[in-house]
Amino acid sequence: MKYIMTAAALALGAGSAVQAADDVTLQLKWVTQAQFAGYYVAQDKGFYEEEDLNVTILPGGPDIAPTQVIAGGGADVTVEWMPAALAAREKGLPLVNIAQPFKSSGMMLTCWKDTGISEPADLANRTLGVWFFGNEFPFMSWMSQLGISTEGKSENGVEVLKQGFNVDPLLQRQADCISTMTYNEYWQVIDAGVSEDELITFKYEDQGVATLEDGLYVLEDNLEDPEFVDKMQRFVRASMKGWKYAEENPDEAAEIVLDNDASGAQTETHQQRMMREIAKLTSGSDGALDPADYQRTVDTLLTGGSSPVITKEPEGAWTHVITDAALK
């Protein structure tokens, strides 16, 4: 591929001066996996190149905070979940959502069925594994709506276990339920030898407390630069082309992700399965943020119990300026 691109560049250079492509650096929220397939597909298929962009994709990880990377100038645009982005904005980092490739949330609570849990009301007096670092707020809002305290086990309370990013608390019966994503941790439980019939799941989307997940965020000041805006319009257009290709060609998309996994930690089976689940979350979006989804996210965060992730209605936290031009 590199040879072909070099040859093409030489051919162009023979007749006229070649204008350099515009550089864009994208910071991912997590490690290289099918959760970010659309961007890798856009790069692999030449969609970014067609938009005259030279895109560098930076994987995330447990020691990488996307908001800190973009704040420090290490990226032009970052993939982040809206709760973290809005929290950062309230604390002084002016992040703005410019596109929302994920329409639906993949977060859910996965429980052992033999505990007798069959509906949300049954969660009282149980131990529940919950992710923190901003991921706990949809859960706290849900418990608040159910009238269930999170201060400890009781007839109307639950014990909250701070869960790491693994499924051990469920497998080891330290918790009756744990936090999982439809495309990742749930399948780790299944791969550990648990039957789907042994489990019951509660999707946050179904409970009305889902918050928006993978969106594209930039710093507000950059949106005052017409050249940056133009660059982001081209980036979003190419990225959404990549996402739609990935939805329609999940196995090929998974292979492209694996080709970009420098760690070698991912497997074909897991990535193909993940891509199929991710496609369910992106299929309802053309890239433009739905204001109703944004408002639901804000309302959920503002009712997240005694210590909400945001304390007031945000202002200027999203824009359609990029998608209006990119998707027309």
Where are these regions (language model features)?
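Secondary-structure end/capping motifs
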Residues: E224-G305
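Periplasmic-binding protein-like
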Residues: P101-C111, S195-E224, R276-I278, G316, ...
